[in-house]
């Protein structure tokens, strides 16, 4: 049974049982605790926790999942995979243990003719949590399982959670006995190679806290209601139903391996374990990489981007070690698309981007690998000659810093060469590099590279900030600096046309210097008296040693001389926008704490005219209801027109008043307090603010996202920018309503209806294509040619037939041709203009010397493509549809020569 059929039967079974089919979520969810989605229930967590009301009582899905902790084991064992599909059924306060067991058992054991998988009930076992007597009774009552095929196991095996705080509960796992060829008797407790887990039924009833291991965490209490979460491994079921030992031999992975085997000088499964590991790495990682890119990740040096980059680079290196010299990534991605596209349409619709990203990484890494490998070999040789088995941290750092080798790749190559790596030395050099980079960035941010140049001015005293009381100030120029060098004068030529950073240090300034999350003011400085022709735009203001204001300027006319008196003027519109943003930040902070509670503590902020960004400590994404509440509370406070008071007081007194302070920040003994609406908001703050909350204008929350583990970010527009954003959305909605010919409030329902109709139409189109193709295949089988005593079906199928469908049709035809020597060759033109083709050769024809993996190359040559496979079945893909007829003629000619 093919994998697509396994998926379909699962979903059909549960839809008939009253479940709503829910599409797979992206493998990227907005949860800082979760790198990738690793279980089918992840998208339903808010429903299990009672944070949101589920739109259905029962749901079913097949979720794409990524697990990468054991990436180094992929291929070495046949148990580890980075991508898998988890089929699941979910109950939200509806049925519980009995219903879950009944539904799982019927699907597994019902005959294939009745929509089930047809497993022999006598080969199925169950495990339950230690004290779950109810589950044991239900297995005996519902499934008729004898007590000797039900085993109790501890928390590590039969109490499920995601490994992080969230829903959890006891579980019951279903195992299939593969027979004595795979190990000793005694059930799952004795041997999990013989007894393979195929389905986990989780009785989700509790919420867990932090913990140190799978069986060491705190149970916080019961969930609002009892739920069911089950997970059936699609790939494991495919292995059993297809009669193969591991996922690499199944119908969705083997084509990737066969593709590479058709190119590499050494084949797969020829007794070379090292080569087989490399083939499996390519087969596994290609699927995972395509899925991750399809869900929006691009290669990078951190987090998910780093995982993707590592997967792609492991593919490339494995191919090189197999002797593949040509670029191969494009063909790998196309094969994954052909096999997985029917289940995950984004692999088809977004293929151009997926392919482009994968090929770009291949191109870049090929250059890196060539140069870096030479350096690695030299370093390894030097290490051996020195009588050592440890590659130095210096060498590992050079590979990383110069050639972009991640430490994981160096460790992998070293292990293959019989060496280890001085990881501690490497980490020390990396830490030193980060320290230097941080220091350089800080120097650039402060707009100076040599503090000694400013020392005289720093010692003379601070810049007096007048911006709380006025926007225009008469001031004296204390110093002029160009690229950190003190100069006596700067003119229009130097400041306006010549490159360089020009700064004025003033004794007094109305300009707010960037700090506390508020960006600097902009405005002008102009000369007075004899220097009145001098004018410059102020584009940035930074603090030097926290006391001097360095005004970055662009001189527009005249010249500025140290000691001159000038007029510094802040742009009033800029300042008004900045005050709106900063006061809006305080309002959003207060609203967050009102809605979420006191644990929503500020972790950082940024505000500029018309915009604010606020980071806060919080575990998990906010619900739509919470976001709406925060926005509403904020705007209610704006409408209330609260007065804004600023005053200076002692730090301890401010804290006793309840003033919020940024954790980790050092404050002086005397602090400035900003109070909005009495108790609504009171914070320590040195920024500029509106005089009353109504001056902020409307606040529109744009979104909420994760910026790190346990830190969330809210972004919003304020004032006129908020109005413009709302006007733009209103115009967009009006345009949609006009195009859809419905009132605005009916647009969501109309769009959902259209999407459902489109999906149904696409599904029906695929069904009709396959029906027509099966009819054509039946006719082709009936009209098989005879060439040299061998029956041949060489047929061009209708357009739009995928590679997976071709394989299914080949199987149908081969079955109809009986046991006489027969060859089936089918070719088609897919929707994306590629030309997939499949060749099957039965055993009788193989005995006559024919091989599918030879004949497939004949087809490939005619359509500008290539292929590979085994003696009985091979497939490939090309790009030249014009050559299809020639390809079929070539097959006939080749048969005539055999």
Curated annotation (Swiss-Prot):
One of its GO terms (cellular component) is cytosol. Zn(2+) binds at residues 582, 586, 685, 689. Its cofactor is Zn(2+). Catalyzes the attachment of alanine to tRNA(Ala) in a two-step reaction: alanine is first activated by ATP to form Ala-AMP and then transferred to the acceptor end of tRNA(Ala). Also edits incorrectly charged Ser-tRNA(Ala) and Gly-tRNA(Ala) via its editing domain. GO terms for biological process: alanyl-tRNA aminoacylation. Keywords: Aminoacyl-tRNA synthetase, ATP-binding, Cytoplasm, Ligase, Metal-binding, Nucleotide-binding, Protein biosynthesis, RNA-binding, tRNA-binding, Zinc. The keyword ATP-binding applies. It comes from Mycolicibacterium gilvum (strain PYR-GCK). This is Alanine--tRNA ligase. It is found in: Cytoplasm. HAMAP family: Ala_tRNA_synth_B. Binds 1 zinc ion per subunit.
